[in-house]
A protein has these predicted regions:
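Extended basic (Lys/Arg/His-rich) segments that typically form rRNA-contacting surfaces
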Residues: 1-203
Length: 203
């Protein structure tokens, strides 16, 4: 199973063999522990539930659910798989499941930007600031026509921006260190520092 949970540490650079600086995102990934294995026969689908981190003040439901795996997780995630996985409750996986050159998908929650206007949120164009401009530089403008007399659902307007789940696909693994559980992927990964990242590899 090539899926890990990790914590985003930030970005840095690695020097390639040709001397070019390669931007990479460092992630403290794993180890993760299997807390439940689901199969088509018992649950109707194939999946693996994995735990990551050390949690505090767990609810009785979570504590009882993870007791057999002997973990007190901070994060618990379920990963669907096509075929049944040969893993047992209590098994652990670390960054050694990945190698330099592998391709992974990174899923995280993007940084929240708060309430944002249409120019920042939807890349609207600002109005003229001179040449007869009326001072309504950053306003939305018309939000509909005379008929039908309504605003269509999904109309791009101001509102809360960010804090949404984002997946960046096909990132190349540039660095792996099993001793410190560090993995570096080329490019940017969604979310703030210390944010949870789900790394999914191509099996």
């Amino acid at each position: 199973m090539k899926t890990l949970l990790g914590t985003k540490l930030g970005m840095t650079q690695l020097l390639a063999e040709d001397g070019k600086a390669v931007p990479v995102t460092l992630i403290q990934a794993g180890p993760v522990t299997v807390t439940q294995v689901k199969t088509v026969e018992t649950d109707g689908y194939n999946a693996v539930q994995i735990a990551y981190g050390e949690g505090k003040n767990l609810s009785k439901a979570v504590a009882g659910h993870t007791k057999s795996a002997k973990v007190t997780p901070k994060f618990l995630r379920e990963v669907r798989v096509d075929q049944p996985v040969e893993a047992k409750i209590g098994d652990s996986f670390d960054v050694s499941v990945f190698a330099v050159g592998d391709t992974v998908d990174a899923t995280g929650v993007s940084k929240g930007k708060g309430f944002a206007g249409t120019i920042k949120r939807h890349n609207f164009k600002a109005s003229n600031q001179s040449h007869g401009g009326q001072g309504k530089v950053r306003r939305v403008g018309s939000i509909g026509s005379m008929y039908p007399q309504k605003v269509w659902k999904g109309k791009k307007m101001a509102g809360r921006m960010g804090a949404e789940q984002v997946t960046v696909k096909n990132l190349e693994v540039a660095y792996v260190d099993p001793e410190t559980n560090l993995i570096g992927v080329k490019g940017a990964v969604p979310g703030p520092r210390k944010g949870l990242i789900v790394l999914g590899g191509k099996a």
